[in-house]
């Protein structure tokens, strides 16, 4: 999977959020966006995920132009800085939720949730509710939900 931003700009109410961004991310790579407060890091991630549409420029995934394609039509996962878990669902149910929405078979959901939870060392918390966990455990639950669906692009 590759993701390329070609001369991407984002302007909202005459304020420039992103100005002529040209970036390329290769499959399997680990990349970090670093910048001062209000530098546009979150705005850039929202553009990459498809949550926002650029004012100009193009966004390519696998070489195909996905500029303006809604997030639901992309295979993308994103964990926000202020991560969100569903408090009335167990950790297992939180992690399983994107798989259930995608119509994945019950046995496959079971396998993938346990595999992902083990990778993030939260398997022993699967029957608990998010508010019973520490902040770090809650964050790992949100990360597991993003990772379990094997998205082409995962943004943290």
Describe the predicted segments one by one.
Residues 65, 100, 107-125:
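Conserved ABC ATPase "signature" region
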Residues 89-98:
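Short coil-to-helix segment of the ABC ATPase nucleotide-binding domain corresponding to the Q-loop/switch region
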Residues 129-133, 137:
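Conserved ABC ATPase signature
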Residues 154-156:
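Catalytic Walker B motif of ABC-type/P-loop ATPase nucleotide-binding domains
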